[in-house]
């Protein structure tokens, strides 16, 4: 909570969290900035996401539709950020399937694509080949989205290490983690 307050007082206009509970804690403490959960929460959390206005990462059509239907039933929008798998292979729509995924879920009027992002597996590694492959995959996905006439919203991918080491990949927003606590990301 204190880190979020300090970040916002220093100019941060968006907050990222790992869990729904962390997002709720920030809302209940009076934080008004948009809050993004950096992974897709379980469907059971959808009512809480809508009530507390917390944006989820989305990468399955089942979750996207359930989220949209719940929002539509309340007459509100369902803003989300699309998680793109560019090579970390934990979460996300595979980079070469992004446009297909968006076409499968975009019919729902409540869904509102607010951003697109990926997670880097090796931005803190001395060896940069895997990082370069990931960034190329992510850029390829963003070009495909734009070529399809879809506004990707806020484009973001940089963690602490990438923010410092690869400033050309900062795009619209960076997601500092360890650097916010005064630590230098490896190497």
Each model region followed by its residue ranges:
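N-terminal active-site wall of soluble small-molecule enzyme domains
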Residues: 1-54, 58-67
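Active-site loop/helix belt of alpha/beta enzymes
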Residues: 1-10, 68-71, 77-78, 86-187
